Amino acid sequence: MRRNQLPTPAFLLLFLLLPRDATTATAKPQYVVLVPSEVYSGVPEKACVSLNHVNETVMLSLTLEYAMQQTKLLTDQAVDKDSFYCSPFTISGSPLPYTFITVEIKGPTQRFIKKKSIQIIKAESPVFVQTDKPIYKPGQIVKFRVVSVDISFRPLNETFPVVYIETPKRNRIFQWQNIHLAGGLHQLSFPLSVEPALGIYKVVVQKDSGKKIEHSFEVKEYVLPKFEVIIKMQKTMAFLEEELPITACGVYTYGKPVPGLVTLRVCRKYSRYRSTCHNQNSMSICEEFSQQADDKGCFRQVVKTKVFQLRQKGHDMKIEVEAKIKEEGTGIELTGIGSCEIANALSKLKFTKVNTNYRPGLPFSGQVLLVDEKGKPIPNKNITSVVSPLGYLSIFTTDEHGLANISIDTSNFTAPFLRVVVTYKQNHVCYDNWWLDEFHTQADHSATLVFSPSQSYIQLELVFGTLACGQTQEIRIHYLLNEDIMKNEKDLTFYYLIKARGSIFNLGSHVLSLEQGNMKGVFSLPIQVEPGMAPEAQLLIYAILPNEELVADAQNFEIEKCFANKVNLSFPSAQSLPASDTHLKVKAAPLSLCALTAVDQSVLLLKPEAKLSPQSIYNLLPGKTVQGAFFGVPVYKDHENCISGEDITHNGIVYTPKHSLGDNDAHSIFQSVGINIFTNSKIHKPRFCQEFQHYPAMGGVAPQALAVAASGPGSSFRAMGVPMMGLDYSDEINQVVEVRETVRKYFPETWIWDLVPLDVSGDGELAVKVPDTITEWKASAFCLSGTTGLGLSSTISLQAFQPFFLELTLPYSVVRGEAFTLKATVLNYMSHCIQIRVDLEISPDFLAVPVGGHENSHCICGNERKTVSWAVTPKSLGEVNFTATAEALQSPELCGNKLTEVPALVHKDTVVKSVIVEPEGIEKEQTYNTLLCPQDTELQDNWSLELPPNVVEGSARATHSVLGDILGSAMQNLQNLLQMPYGCGEQNMVLFVPNIYVLNYLNETQQLTEAIKSKAINYLISGYQRQLNYQHSDGSYSTFGNHGGGNTPGNTWLTAFVLKAFAQAQSHIFIEKTHITNAFNWLSMKQKENGCFQQSGYLLNNAMKGGVDDEVTLSAYITIALLEMPLPVTHSAVRNALFCLETAWASISQSQESHVYTKALLAYAFALAGNKAKRSELLESLNKDAVKEEDSLHWQRPGDVQKVKALSFYQPRAPSAEVEMTAYVLLAYLTSESSRPTRDLSSSDLSTASKIVKWISKQQNSHGGFSSTQDTVVALQALSKYGAATFTRSQKEVLVTIESSGTFSKTFHVNSGNRLLLQEVRLPDLPGNYVTKGSGSGCVYLQTSLKYNILPVADGKAPFALQVNTLPLNFDKAGDHRTFQIRINVSYTGERPSSNMVIVDVKMVSGFIPMKPSVKKLQDQPNIQRTEVNTNHVLIYIEKLTNQTLGFSFAVEQDIPVKNLKPAPIKVYDYYETDEFTVEEYSAPFSDGSEQGNA
């Protein structure tokens, strides 16, 4: 090291200006009280006091003052003479964030009092939310945990007013209130609907203070990736490098390489900031490379960089790489991306830590790091430091880590600041707009002089790096003392305290002997590093000199983010077989509660999780500012008295005082660590009485300001007195044979989500079964202890793997008579060759012939695969299972020229998959329903099952079911009431509303079980979520929501329907109030002056237009909805609506026309309103319109209405609108007054109602629903009301026997214990004659369901004209991949001007799947509102059809090759008039080998 010395100025002027006692030792009593300048309310804090030269016991008091009030924190706390200790205190709270604290020390002869500002911070407890995984599919269950701890990470039994789930549209879809965290943790879950809004959801936890903690997760339709594409390349490269090596690898989730084609695309894109006038020069520069992956699944390419013009500006300063890997055999292609920054800064210097202040006579020190452009340390290089303004120059050499410790002797320094610039290489100063030059960054730092009137100092030697928990760190302290002041002293006491997490953590003292006259030297303090000090601690040390001067220093230490609760998680081994038993061991502090999680690595590949980590936990701690500065708050100053700034003449020389001293002092050091110091010692630098703006020596810039401005790259200006901390740039087996077989069918995404309490020894264990997925599982845990607090485990892995396994490839469904190739692929991941036998289990359900000859065994060497195929022709209908087994054999035979080894464990892998085998033609269903009510007599019903002449052979099947409850069938099928799609806002309500009626009915009849309740509640939750997809921003709802087009208005009818349903569902699930309020407000704006409601939006059901006019029918419906919410009759909206209806009824009653539909709604509306007279008038009028058949009663629309076609022995099925209007009449009979219970109905009304019920019950389908949505909803409401009115809890039972003319006989027992149980039997004789006998006492509901397929027959009177054509798009002769287009033309040819909403249901030809983008694109057409892909069907929703032809097309592609392809049907039907339908068939254009379209 070499140094250039410059003369230093004397302190003469300062000496003359200082008070006379600055150099005179005294022994006056000295008090120091230390309190954090920011304190937490409700959390214990400490006030520390040290006394010097106090020869008596004194009393310490702390008083908090705010708003003219005083609160005693410490009252007359006795403090022994010459002691140093801390006393705890707690501030319960303050209405103001800034208050004052007064310290008073008094004794027999002493009194000291001072006041200073402090800030009170409300200590919000750290809270975090953990979900079981970061991404979910529609219909999955979201599981999450809420955890609360205090600032010491101990569990907090906190109660949160509300926890809720928020959708991407900020709708609240689920809510829990008053959630109490026993032991600091609570687990919750909720189901996503099968059709939720996709995007980012939030779990929101709201605290009592109103603060919200949010945790996000994503809902997305996804397929878990089988493998990951990894790009290995350097993150940064120098712009002078000529080659860039890139490696792309494919790795399965279970760790094995992916065979396939690797394609690399390497680009340097042009900068968007560059002008576009350079034409071709502005284009991106790209190169492409392609090659088969090697045996490690990788492709390595060394890219020449010359083509990318790295020295030229105007392009992005990075190289971007995209790698695609197409898996061999499947064609599955996944992508990975990577990038490499281009750097012209070939070296970087940075201070990792450096003194912020300097003290003359003590070494100024710091540490610098030298790295190259990649962040790699540069060792054994000379670096130069220059200290200004003195010009000192020093040379240091970096070590093997690129670090150099800098130490500068400051013995002769007197400047108010110093600046240190460290340089490795000088830069060539030249700038070119289009050309890059080599650049080397410097490290630049400024430090400020610490003022001491006696030139006495203490300084903490810098400690570099992060301190590990549990270690003892020796801290070296340098000191320099004024000999004149200390000459009579035998020792000096140094006091130190440690501040962590904003509070005083620990304290101590060190007595330094001065008997040897050692006024300059070093001593050490051992500091024990504890978890409570993390993540950063401040060490403050000070001493009080005999001249009353206080000298001090402070330093920040980075502490390892550790926890007192050490958590260890382990599996017995790193690899296990699928479906094997294992256990997860956890060890932590005794009696901890541990939360365990294990997730499929595939999920994390899809969406990497922001998992719990020490960093994320520590980030939750409430923050205190280091300095505790109070901006804009009055602070009681305790500066020294000012000194004169006038010129002084000495020995004939005139001295001008230096103004605006930029030095730091002891006070600023305490302030830098957020400590308020109350003392009578000298802690301030001199202050001149006159403010003087100009500082001539520095050209008008104050030294401190210059120090800030001068800090350049690599420096950081931090709290005064605390050294700056920088960031690093760098980122043998027993041969006993055991046959082991695995049958794999359990494939979860989250495997473990459990709470495990630990025993007194701190051990716990969870026994689990490894799922069947061959993948890597990532497991982690956190534990909570009341004593040691929170602890986190590291993430551990378990590979679920077996040395070989089997994969089956087969289609979803085929038509009887078709043949397909079943492929079984065996993968061997052992290091040696083995003999494998692959068998397909024989079954009478199919015929399987091996393809390419039959071999007893197959040889598969390490990391190879073998595919075995069978040509399969199904023989049975329905779900046909295929069971394939691969077994490793003990065999001495050679595999080619390689020896086979006998596996240590001979494994069998069995995979079971199914194919649905469907009959030809289209499916038809007929039902026969009857209500049988024997009263201690035997009733008998003879009936027969017949089949139509065009039935497809073998397709017929029939069942007979018995239920003791009229709603029993619906209860069994709450989510499957209709065999129709549910893809719009109204259809979704049929999944939602019946659950309310079922819950209310079972509650009222005291039959509700937990199982039914749980199921219905979950359906309500799911339906609520889905319905919000159809909500508009104004609170209204429409059939397709915003999906129907940006300008689609809200639908008045649907909004009323949703409003009523949400209001009624509130008693069962959480419904956000604003959804009800906003819908009602929107609906209110649609009410006209006459009380009627105007229509908004398109009515998809024409039946609503069948009344006098749309307005009356609609108004009646909305009035019913408002009354059922329920709103009182006195409410203005209801009162006005009833006026509208009364006016309409007056008009209708004078009319000669029969408005049955409208009258049915009016009757129910007046019944709900309690208007007996109007109800009676309407029911009397309706009675004249009734259709009376034997013991049943119903209503139908005027005119000759065509019934739904049925076989002669079945009752004709009524159209949807007639079921709906009949159900409304039934509701009117069952509602005499809204306030009266249903059971108070007259016997006359009940008698009429029972006749209506008999007719309605006969219209039910086999799932408990009816034809369409509205008839199902209203009819189930009416049936539930009737069921409640007639329910009796009888101990009697009914016996039902069904017999055929052959030998078949089956008896059912129905009683109060099993009345909700569905009892069913398959009928053997088709066709056949049967008799049903009923005896006992009570009512039973009987249903016979017959299903069969028929071949489509052209009908000249079809209500829809349907034309289908197919055209090949890609005719692959090999048959590996074929695509074709389906072109559909459709129009309405029925009797109405237009249809209702229409569904086009396109079934896929076997082995083909739709190309989803082409299906989605159909929604761009004006009349097509929505499309769905549902297994092997494409559903297209059309708003309405007229006689104008609507044409559209989409593409399909081959998924699995199938031979002898059969045609597939396309069905077009009216959603609300399901008897109006047309069916056509189409064939794949490859079926006959031609390339022409056919249908």
Curated annotation (Swiss-Prot):
Cysteine disulfide links: C48-C86, C249-C298, C267-C286, C469-C562, C594-C783, C642-C689, C833-C861, C859-C895, C933-C1339, C1092-C1140
Presence of the UniProt keyword Nucleotide-binding in the record: no
Tissues where the protein occurs: Highest expression in liver, medium expression in ovary, heart and stomach. Low expression in lung, kidney and uterus. Protein found in plasma.
UniProt signal peptide: 1-24
Cross-referenced InterPro entries: A-macroglobulin_rcpt-bd, A-macroglobulin_rcpt-bd_sf, A2M/Complement_sys, A2M_N_BRD, A2M_TED, Alpha-macroglob_thiol-ester_cl, Alpha-macroglobulin_TED, Ig-like_fold
Pfam families assigned: A2M, A2M_BRD, A2M_recep, MG2, MG3, MG4, TED_complement
PROSITE patterns: ALPHA_2_MACROGLOBULIN
Sorted UniProt keywords: Bait region, Disulfide bond, Glycoprotein, Protease inhibitor, Secreted, Serine protease inhibitor, Signal, Thioester bond
Gene3D superfamilies on file: 1.50.10.20, 2.20.130.20, 2.60.120.1540, 2.60.40.1930, 2.60.40.1940, 6.20.50.160, Alpha-macroglobulin, receptor-binding domain (2.60.40.690), Immunoglobulins (2.60.40.10)
GO molecular function: endopeptidase inhibitor activity; serine-type endopeptidase inhibitor activity
Subcellular location: Secreted
GO annotation, cellular component aspect: collagen-containing extracellular matrix; extracellular region; extracellular space
Any coiled-coil regions, as ranges: none
Keyword Thylakoid found: no
Function: Is able to inhibit all four classes of proteinases by a unique 'trapping' mechanism. This protein has a peptide stretch, called the 'bait region' which contains specific cleavage sites for different proteinases. When a proteinase cleaves the bait region, a conformational change is induced in the protein which traps the proteinase. The entrapped enzyme remains active against low molecular weight substrates (activity against high molecular weight substrates is greatly reduced).
Family: Belongs to the protease inhibitor I39 (alpha-2-macroglobulin) family.
Official protein name in the record: Pregnancy zone protein
